[in-house]
């Protein structure tokens, strides 16, 4: 579906709460130029590293850090696509702590036409979008809701 938004070709992608890195690795396989996989679990980051090596994808790196901690650092080049698939037990406050730095006024993480994708349980409320980030679509798949947002 992200292919339809035209955001993957050469894109800079952040996969936050990456787990095995499946979402970010899929983006890399579909033409993303640079992918950063971020997960707080050392085991998950090691799995990401193994998956990167086994797939032979260039431009993909894995970082062991909490997403909010990673985002507190310097942004560098802005991201065109941010994928956030946190554990379902992640609190709404913790999710907001991840979303908020994406749109900070100094050194923002998002490119002007970026897409932010948040995957949550259908039992979870809609994310609290910080000022500067606006939902433009959502899609429900069984017990999962995927929310799409963009810079406002």
Protein language model annotation of sequence segments:
Residues 1-152:
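Class I S-adenosyl-L-methionine-dependent methyltransferase catalytic core
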